[in-house]
């Protein structure tokens, strides 16, 4: 079985089993960017089912990147309360301030520029590119890693390093099906 066949099977499975994620519904471009940014910060080290109700409340209280950049720290922490890892909230606000100041309130649209923002690393930058900008990029998360290990029968420590797996990720081809 080749990578394209596996990709098609995964997409078919997803189409039939996907769950509703409020940050992936049909949105304006600007809202899609903001919702993706907020959700990716919230999802760092936290399960989707935990994030959903916090995300909905957060977006209702702080509906835009410019509002987030201006929100008082106490208000931000109150809306983040219960999610833990409060450095994520602080970094999210720092990122909003920088985006408002340096990018006119719009997310930068390259992996390299995104990685320069506070709290955004390799995975988050690629996830934002795939979801918010519909780019043909596959971020390496635990699910993709698990599939790669199974497809390539990887067992050795050197075969399961992030660098090695990132080299294998294009086996699946590229798709803009992140949303």
Region annotations inferred by a language model:
Residues 10:
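Non-catalytic nucleic-acid substrate-recognition regions in nucleic-acid-modifying enzymes
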Residues 4, 13-179:
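Catalytic cores of DNA base-excision repair glycosylases
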């Amino acid at each position: 079985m080749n990578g394209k066949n596996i990709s098609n099977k995964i997409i078919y499975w997803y189409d039939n089993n996907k769950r509703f994620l409020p940050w992936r519904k049909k949105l304006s471009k600007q809202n899609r960017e903001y919702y993706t940014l907020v959700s990716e910060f919230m999802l760092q080290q936290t399960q989707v089912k935990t994030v959903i109700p916090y995300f909905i409340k957060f977006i209702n209280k702080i509906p835009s990147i410019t509002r987030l950049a201006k929100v008082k720290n106490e208000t931000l922490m109150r809306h983040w309360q219960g999610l833990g890892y409060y450095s994520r909230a602080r970094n999210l606000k720092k990122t909003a301030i920088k985006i408002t100041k340096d990018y006119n309130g719009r997310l930068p649209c390259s992996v390299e520029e995104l990685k320069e923002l506070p709290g955004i690393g390799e995975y988050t930058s690629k996830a934002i590119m795939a979801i918010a900008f519909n780019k043909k990029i596959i971020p390496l998360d635990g699910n993709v890693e698990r599939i790669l290990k199974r497809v390539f029968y990887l067992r050795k420590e050197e075969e399961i390093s992030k660098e090695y797996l990132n080299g294998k990720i294009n086996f699946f081809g590229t798709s803009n099906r992140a949303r």
